């Protein structure tokens, strides 16, 4: 990829969004209206009395000793799981939180020490998933977010610029799953001439279980069927990294910290201010959280449970209990800073005990069980853990074509692998974009936009139905476009729509 800017890569604090004070996020939260009530749904009767699985059975399936140990531990915890009760939930203590706005005061940066500090860092990108949510069958990291530019290109470009500007060696490590490993290893061949050391490793594979019995889906001595297995979440990174030998290798090379993030989060760049704080305050585990907004529905919130920081995945909560958390505003970005020596010790002492989440996929009309661990749940395992409240700039995930449209528009500018808000846009917020199901896959999305509209002055866009956009279109303010069932709406080339509602008959109304 090519960047036109020649300025030094930015690792200092980015321009902050107006997110308000940290304290203001907790106003009027009533935590104790439903004392002593369980949050999680109960197990099916058969699963509650599931028989143990012999280690020999798992070994016969090809599982490694540390994999089967982790799987057995999770399965046992699932059957005998501890409930979370609302009367134990509290707002995180101020001593467990730090506001990004205050880092330069709490932990001032010594710029003369920047290179030495960066040389202690390893960047790890989580690359286990395919782009299924957008209709792609390849590794999500290989998706284009700009003409000829992929998520992986962005990560490499950013780290390469840091290495050049500071004369350091920050390596890029990619954690793949069995779904992405071979493809990614082929793709990274193109970066051989770049000033970035790239390493990959493959995370564990766990067997699916039947929901009603918790019996294994795959059978020993049969051909491996990928549909009967799954990657057990981002929390598997710690054990898989240890198994790969990379933790010991990096410790021997003088590395002290790892910065973990999702490959599709365009905001997860190296931040020297955060790294400096982690270093000076001797933090073992730092989790970046941000202000939760209306579109944040699938993910985790931060709370204090039994006087420890705790990440709660909303997908695991009974639907009728979700209202308890509607005012919880600390949202997990999955940007995580970890002390390498600390995580190595926890693994060796078998004290890394991550909570899990459960998914119930359907295969051949039968409900399965997948037990997964988010990496952010490690926050409760480390002695000196902290949550860092960061601006939304550091959380730019691309999980849908709606987010892809914003990323590809003139709202943002690409600079050395970083995404920066266009200086010509007033304010710091990005527009709220909701594209209908007709745009849900990348192929359909690309068919429906002859070119990406000008969104520089857009606040809100909703598109529903069979809608096609021409070229050189400008959208401003609030624009709502609805094609009624059986009708098609074509937005002509060169049109400027500002605060308009377009119906299926192409009537244009002021909003």
UniProtKB/Swiss-Prot annotation:
It is an enzyme of class 2 (transferase). Residues 460-511 are annotated as: Oligomerization. Mg(2+) binds at residues 140, 264. Pathway: Carbohydrate metabolism; galactose metabolism. The keyword Nucleotidyltransferase applies. The keyword Transferase applies. The active site is at 399. GO terms for biological process: culmination involved in sorocarp development; galactose metabolic process; glycogen metabolic process; UDP-alpha-D-glucose metabolic process. One of its GO terms (cellular component) is cytoplasm. Keywords: Magnesium, Metal-binding, Nucleotidyltransferase, Transferase. Its EC number is 2.7.7.9. Substrate binds at residues 128-129, 262-264. Transmembrane segments: none annotated. It catalyses: alpha-D-glucose 1-phosphate + UTP + H(+) = UDP-alpha-D-glucose + diphosphate. Homooctamer. This is UTP--glucose-1-phosphate uridylyltransferase 1. It comes from Dictyostelium discoideum (Social amoeba). The gene is uppA.
